[in-house]
Every structure is written in structure tokens, then in C-alpha cells.
Amino acid sequence: MSQRFKCVGLLMYVSAVLTAAVPATADVSLPISTPVVVRVVASRAMALGDNVGGAAVTIRDVDTGAVLAAGRQTGPTGDAKNIMQTPHLHTEPVFSVRESASFTTELQLSKPTLVEVVGEGPLKFPQVLRRASKTVLLYPGKAVSGDGIILELNGLLVNIETPSADRPLGIGDEGTLRATVKMLCGCVVEPFGNWDSRKMDLYGELRLGEKVIQTIDVYHQAKGVFAGNFKIPRSLKGEQSISLRFVAADADAANVGVDEVTYPLVPWEQSRDATGREIAPITPPLPP
């Protein structure tokens, strides 16, 4: 046998041995556990914690549309001093230095996966529900930890407390518009606070349809409470309803909140101004 054939035979033998050494069923793409932390936070404020119902979080595979994880963010709002008052480098953790609300899950990934992460909240206040999302590339086994994937929600939580929605207003009467103003995390807006109302635009409006009848100056009354007086003009004789709107916005209007209530109007002859008596609230009809 020539030297050439001997070499070829040796190479074939070595190749066969190496092939036999690697199991034919070996799977190099087995799923690997990949922890992921997501935090839904209020813009320029803190995490959406249990006090506002937390936030709904969904992680979805961008390519397939499959939901990889879903649940609710739980926990406390966080440490205000560390989050709002302590200077941080851009790369330093802020929300995870001390405990704050988050959503934690463990995904099983077998390849680099582009995901869409969606957060919605605050769940306790559906009338101001906000939504934010990000696309993030996750790598199998690379844990997303620390502050995690941060989703920031813009807006303010505004709620008109008085007049109550069940009380008609009388033409010619004076009244007081009172509302609470908070960040979406439930954090209190007040003068000289972490969320300084002096740097915000807060006011009320008396409205007839789309027309502003009166702009109402409001003043701080208590923690997160602002109030101002209004008067319903007698010129509205014959009108059936009137609306009060409370508007709140931060300095550059990145965060805005509005609440509006429409009230039945009673004629001047039945008003408090004319009768000297409070107008009775609307009594809901009894069920049959």
C-alpha cells in the first residue's frame, strides 16, 4: 500500500474517532435561566408601589409575539431621600439602593432574544392609567439586575374632592373647588417639597361646554390639597349643567394631570344664594 493511501486511511480513522466522541444528540441550545428585573416609575419621582396598586408588566418576544412573562409590580415606593435628594452618577443605581417596588421574573432563553417590555399603571387609578414600553435584547444567562429595566410613566394624579359629584350647583352661588394633586407614584405635591408646587402650574376652570367661564386661582391648603373659590354667574339662567376642571402641570409640561366633573345646575330661585339653604344632593333612584 502506498504511503499516500496510508495517510488517507489514518485521517479517516481519526475523523471517525472524533465524530464518535461527540454524541449525535448533543443540544447546544438548551434554555438557560435568565433573571430579569423591571421597574415602573413615575416621571421625576419614585416607583409605583402598592399604595397606588403597583403596575402591570408584560415581557413579550418581539419575533414571535409570545408572552414570556407577565405580572404585577409590588413593593414600597422607595426611599425619597436617596432617590430624590442624593446626587448620583448616571451609571449608579438609584431605585435599588434601598428596597423599592419592582417586577422580578426568570426567563428561560436559548438564544439572544429581543423583547418588548411593557408597563401600565397606576392600577389603583384606572382613570389616569399610563403605558410605557422598551425593546431590550436579552442574552441567555446574563441577569438583568440592580435598577433593572426602567419604564417611566408621565403624568400627575389629580382628583376633585369638592364639590362632590352628587351635589347640584345653584346659579348665582359661590363655591370652593378643592382637589388633591400627586405624582403617579402617590407622592405628595406641596410647596418646598420634593415635588414643589411652586414650580408647577395649578389652577381650576369653570366651564360651560368647551367655553371657560372663569379661571380659578388655587392655593395650598394641606398635604397635596389645593383649593380656590368660584362664583356661578346669573347669566347662565336656563343652562342645565356646568363643569369644574382642575389642571396641574409641572414646569415644562412633561407631567400633566386633569380632573373634570360636570354638575347639574338649579335655577337661581332654588340656589343657596336665594334660599339661604344648602342644595340637597342628588338621591339615586331606588331599585325596582
Model-assigned labels for residue ranges:
Residues 78-103, 222-230:
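Aromatic sugar-binding surface patches on proteins
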